[in-house]
């Protein structure tokens, strides 16, 4: 009986170790990503993104940014969007880093966050993953 329990525990530990190893890097394209929202003066909202790809990319940056507005941290709806086709500075070319920022003229007292589509492309393909920022309240 002890041998069976020991074998079962060993199998469980092996599965946990393999699962942790397999999910350590879930992306072929991104080794690090971060997205932030900051409330600036006069209601302005700053959205920043920072991307470290796994290797040199043909293109890297934000593919799409959706700005959400709500009140009392509820009832959020999309009020604006930024797309890389309209804002080419959102993408860097032939790079090992992708970072940038956009601003939105918010209304003091309202809450904002963004959904940022981080993007990387190499000669074999591309990947886009969407991450939400923190919620901030616009102020004067």
Language model: regions and residue ranges:
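Short, solvent-exposed, Trp/other aromatic-anchored flexible loops in extracytoplasmic proteins
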Residues: 83-116
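Sec-dependent signal peptide cleavage junction
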Residues: 18-29
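Solvent-exposed serine/threonine-rich low-complexity stretches and specific carbohydrate-binding patches
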Residues: 64-65, 75-93, 132-135
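Bacterial N-terminal signal peptides
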Residues: 9-17
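Short beta-strand elements
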Residues: 122-140
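Beta-strand-rich extracellular modules
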Residues: 117-121
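Positively charged n-region of N-terminal signal peptides that target proteins for export
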Residues: 1-4
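Short, surface-exposed binding/anchoring microloops in extracellular/periplasmic proteins
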Residues: 30-69
């Amino acid at each position: 009986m002890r041998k069976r329990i020991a074998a079962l525990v060993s199998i469980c530990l092996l599965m946990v170790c393999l699962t942790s190893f397999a999910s350590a890097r879930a992306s072929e394209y991104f080794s690090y990503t971060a997205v932030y929202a900051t409330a600036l003066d006069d209601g302005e909202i700053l959205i920043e993104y920072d991307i470290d790809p796994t290797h040199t990319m043909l293109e890297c940056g934000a593919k799409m940014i959706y700005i959400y507005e709500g009140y009392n941290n509820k009832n959020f709806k999309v009020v604006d969007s930024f797309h890389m086709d309209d804002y080419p500075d959102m993408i860097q070319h032939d790079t090992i880093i992708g970072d940038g920022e956009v601003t939105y003229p918010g209304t003091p007292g309202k809450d904002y966050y963004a959904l940022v589509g981080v993007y990387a492309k190499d000669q074999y393909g591309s990947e886009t993953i969407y991450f939400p920022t923190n919620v901030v309240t616009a102020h004067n």
